[in-house]
Amino acid sequence: MQIEYSKKAVKYINSADKLTKKRLKEAIEKIPLGDIKRLKGINEAYRLRVGDLRVLFSMKNDIIYIENIIPRGQAYKRL
């Protein structure tokens, strides 16, 4: 599977501390096996839990597109 990142996701990863970067990288690489859940009301949208963070992504044709990485409290307010 190929993984692509949005500008928002890259910005968040670059601003995160080393431990958070490592946890995000490991979780994203294991997306099919991770704690993922399909988001209701949005086609092809999923979320991955990484501690208190939520990785919002979509999957199409063996491509995983990481759309955003945000804290849990903000993740569900925006939907």
PLM regions with names:
Residues Q2-I3, L19, V50-L53, S58-L79:
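Enriched for short, Lys/Arg-rich terminal
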Residues K8, G41-E44, P71:
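Residues that form or immediately flank small-molecule/cofactor binding pockets and catalytic motifs
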Residues I13, D17, I28, P32, ...:
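Short amphipathic alpha-helical/adjacent loop interface patches that line ligand
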Residues K22-L48, Y76:
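A short, surface-exposed loop/turn module that caps and links secondary-structure elements
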Residues Y12, A45-R47, R54-L56:
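Short aromatic/hydrophobic contact patches that present stacked aromatics
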Residues M1-K22:
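Arg/Lys-rich, positively charged N-terminal/basic patches that mediate binding to nucleic acids
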